[in-house]
Amino acid sequence: MAGIPHDHYEPKSGLEKWLHKRLPVVALVYDTLMIPTPRNLNWMWIWGIVLTYCLAHMIVTGIVLAMHYTPHVDMAFASVEHIMRDVNGGHMIRYLHANGASLFFFAVYIHIFRGLYYGSYKAPREVTWIVGMIIYLCMMGTAFMGYVLPWGQMSFWGATVITGLFGAIPGIGEPIQTWLLGGPAVDNATLNRFFSLHYLLPFVIAALVAVHIWAFHSTGNNNPTRGEVRRGSKEVVKKDTLPFWPYFVIKDLF
């Protein structure tokens, strides 16, 4: 983590040293978990770990649902009913996925408000903020396409209205709308595209989350006083901070 003096991973056993020279993945995990974190963080800082849980929750439940879903206009709704009625625990998995999305957005709005209130968008954390906003846009796109997948009346007309917004762009809007729909109107090609992107984007979000974490590990965490951690030496840093693991992980869990 650039800029903040801290203890680095030191391999001890022969196997650890061998792996560290070739693939320092243990050092990466160590530096991620042991980031010096300001001691004065309040409850507004718990939402990052809530969002991490939500993303993992959505990916796992989504993969299970995708095993039973059929992206075809004649079978999509029936496949959702099949999940609800015939798949063991299918109704629970679907509701966990749908309500998990609500928790995801609830947590991300508080996370964004925290950033606005405490100035986390200001230097030196602009990149962290920008990546976070890209994640938010990807979340909105993923949620919208997931809403379309059951292929009921609200799904169909929702897809028609939202894609129609792109058609209103002067000059280039109509080609963009046609490309999004896969044809002149909402149809099977649209459903296939939306399902494919709905499955893909969560993994894009996961990659962006890794970049997001990398960015704030480089600059250090913000805190309620908005004061920067003193960085003269490891001893000085330890007076202002504690390691993220185990102190803040345990605090966030409880």
Where are these regions (language model features)?
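Membrane-embedded alpha-helical bundles that constitute the cytochrome b-like, heme-associated redox core
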Residues: 1-254
